[in-house]
Amino acid sequence: MAFPQTIMGKFGWEKLTTTAQKHKLGTRMQIADREFVYSSTGEAITAGKLVMGKAGTAAHQVDLAVSASSAGATTVTLSGSLSVAKDLYKDGFLIFNDVEEEGHMYRVKGNTLVSSATGCVVTIDEEDGLVAAITTSQQVGLYENPYKAGEAHDANDVDHSPLGWTCVDIASGSYGWLCVKGFTTALVDGTPAAGVPLIASNGVDGAVEVYDEDGSVNLSPVGYMGPIAGVAGEYGLIKANIE
């Protein structure tokens, strides 16, 4: 069954939340000049907060050993002993991080269950399969879908890249939309002037602050302040520019 990758929405659809998944994580929605991405939450997040992805399992993300497989194969078998829940990495990514095929990335369709055992089989969601044969020398990493179980951007413990802003309160374990482009409301840290670039705050969870080129806070901009200066601790109009 095919799912649309981009939805043409109506005003207000960005505020819809559900406890059951309605779209593939990462599905895009456009409403006039605003763009959104479909995500789930790992904690309750109120409206206007910047969201980041969760950390995931570091031991699965790099240097996993594999069994040999031919070009065109649609499965990769992990040869090391691991504990992996069934389909934990569905709609996530398999990357080759080192040796020969390094730099390649594949979408994951699903994975088998293993508990302190070898032989986890990862099925890739690409009909042409692997672009080249792999040997036992290759090293891979597994990543869950970045839009799965997001959390408010943590000022003191950044786990992942920023994903977008909530448009309404989203309960823990629920599904909803994050604004990634266009105008939206955001929690403000400090008093950024009108039109200045903004970064994720390093002092207030889920907030944005002014980009400080000459200071110590030189993170990549995630948006721009709107037509008036922001007020510390309040929500202001910003132009999101994450994607």
What are these regions (language model features)?
Residues D91-D98:
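Short conserved beta-strand and strand-loop elements enriched in small hydrophobics
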Residues M1-K86, D98-E243:
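Extracellular receptor-binding modules and their adjoining Ser/Thr/Gly/Asp/Asn-rich linkers
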